[in-house]
Regions:
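Helix-loop junction within the histidine kinase core
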Residues: 21-32
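Short conserved segment of the HATPase_c
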Residues: 118-130
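Short alpha-helical Gxxx[C/S/T] motif in the catalytic ATP-binding
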Residues: 143, 147
Length: 182
């Protein structure tokens, strides 16, 4: 229903403002724990399975062996949720792919789509508060800004690569401890 949809938008805005306030005031707590990264990402993918547009495939691409990583799973899911939501809104054909790579000291988690892409002159601006590619797009334009701040708090970085009409890839690189699941 329209009321339920608007309630969800308002709740998301309130949560974004609260997160932004916590980050700016230094009160955002990270709670790293050992998690199976494949399982964590699969949970996020499952939450978006019902939002995949017709003509779009939601894919995963993980290493052959699962990895345990020491990360804040709640914040990773928050970041991935933002990336997935944006990718699914901007992809009408093709696919959206969630992937990760792990080495001994870091992890790279990303979302790649075959959507409309982002103009080169907007790539730096998309991480600014209240910045949206379209004035008619839903949301307050805080999601990517919050993601970047959280990743920086984790001593990581956000990378974006995009070409108009071809697609966009968002990747977070984070230092972390990891081990293979036997």
């Amino acid at each position: 229903s329209l009321i339920g949809h608007n309630n969800k938008l308002l709740l998301n805005l309130i949560n974004d403002v609260i997160d932004l306030s916590k980050i700016e005031s230094g009160y955002l707590e990270l709670r790293p724990d050992w998690v199976n990264l494949s399982e964590l990402l699969d949970e996020s993918v499952a939450e978006y399975a019902h939002q995949v547009p017709s003509g779009v495939e939601l894919l995963t691409n993980y290493p052959a062996h699962d990895s345990l990583v020491e990360l804040d799973s709640l914040r990773i899911k928050q970041i991935l949720s933002n990336f997935l939501s944006n990718a699914l809104k901007n992809t009408t054909t093709g696919h959206v792919e969630v992937f990760y790579e792990v080495d001994h000291q870091s992890v790279r988690i990303g979302v790649k789509d075959t959507g409309r892409g982002i103009p080169q002159n907007m790539l730096e601006k998309i991480f600014e508060r209240f910045e949206k590619l379209d004035s008619f797009a839903q949301g307050a334009g805080l999601g990517l800004s919050i993601c970047k701040l959280i990743v920086e708090k984790m001593n990581g970085r956000v990378l974006v690569d995009s070409q108009l009409g071809i697609g966009t890839t968002f990747v977070i690189e984070l230092p972390c401890r990891s081990m293979l699941v036997e």
